[in-house]
């Protein structure tokens, strides 16, 4: 059974331009499942995605999985409160259903990345984008897993983030939004998944400090994205600072 269902699958549409148009319309209508299926169909056709199309794919799945991540957090909190009560079993069953949906979507994205999108022919920027995305979706899996499964997803996330980082440091400027977004998410991974606040702070601070020295050279078309991510890095550093100082 597919992780996401949509009328687009039944329509049999395989025209690249039409699918991109559908994805854009679906985004405006906030129908992210349709948006994800449209972009997945393009990727499975073997077409290399341009920058706009990569962003459409990312936004679609981020919203689809984001809804499940939010539901899982809420249900997980409710399950803890209801432990030992008559509603405990029912709550646990519902939590598992949300978890299964989230897991299927993440595995869907990871399969798409490894089988269709990360190829030898793509450029460095696309490869960094996809390895970052791979790290993100293994991180989302690790959030809901325990034991050996958690260990495997955590290791895979770190490996993907590290591959993206090595490429980004060689190929992208310190103010490039993809490089900054990667540093943001990698630092969140260390803070939330590996419980390493000092490492998280170090990574986030290095990215912010490097970017702030070059802020005047940011291109107009990426200025808004780059400065927004820099602000998010600074916000996290402010939030984490007390723990970093305690651990150091």
Swiss-Prot record:
| UniProt cross-references to InterPro entries, sorted A to Z | 14-3-3 (IPR000308), 14-3-3_CS (IPR023409), 14-3-3_dom_sf (IPR036815), 14-3-3_domain (IPR023410)
Span of the signal peptide: none
Return the PROSITE patterns for the record. Answer: 1433_1, 1433_2
For this protein, the record's Pfam families field holds: 14-3-3
| Database matches in PANTHER family | 14-3-3 PROTEIN (PTHR18860)
**Protein family (similarity comment):** Belongs to the 14-3-3 family.
Q: What is this protein called?
A: 14-3-3 protein homolog 2
- Per the UniProt record, the source organism is Echinococcus multilocularis
């Amino acid at each position: 059974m597919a992780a996401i269902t949509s009328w687009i699958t039944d329509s049999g549409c395989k025209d690249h331009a039409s699918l991109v148009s559908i994805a854009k319309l679906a985004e405006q209508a906030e129908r992210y499942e349709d948006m994800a299926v449209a972009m997945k169909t393009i990727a499975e056709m073997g077409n290399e995605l341009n920058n706009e199309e990569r962003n459409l794919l990312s936004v679609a799945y981020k919203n689809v999985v984001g809804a499940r991540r939010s539901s899982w957090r809420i249900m997980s909190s409710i399950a803890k409160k209801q432990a030992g009560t008559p509603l405990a079993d029912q709550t646990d069953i519902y939590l598992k259903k949300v978890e299964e949906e989230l897991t299927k979507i993440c595995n869907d994205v990871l399969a798409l990345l490894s089988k269709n999108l990360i190829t030898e022919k793509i450029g460095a920027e696309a490869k960094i984008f996809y390895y970052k995305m791979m790290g993100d979706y293994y991180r989302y899996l690790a959030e809901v897993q325990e034991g050996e499964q958690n260990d495997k997803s955590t290791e895979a996330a770190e490996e993907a983030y590290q591959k993206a980082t090595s490429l980004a440091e060689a190929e992208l400027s310190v103010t490039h939004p993809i490089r900054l977004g990667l540093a943001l998410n990698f630092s969140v991974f260390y803070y939330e998944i590996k419980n390493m606040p000092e490492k998280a702070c170090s990574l986030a601070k290095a990215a912010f400090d490097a970017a702030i020295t070059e802020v005047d050279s940011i291109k107009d078309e990426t200025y808004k994205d780059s400065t927004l991510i820099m602000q998010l890095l600074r916000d996290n550093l402010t939030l984490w600072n007390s723990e970093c100082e305690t651990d150091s």
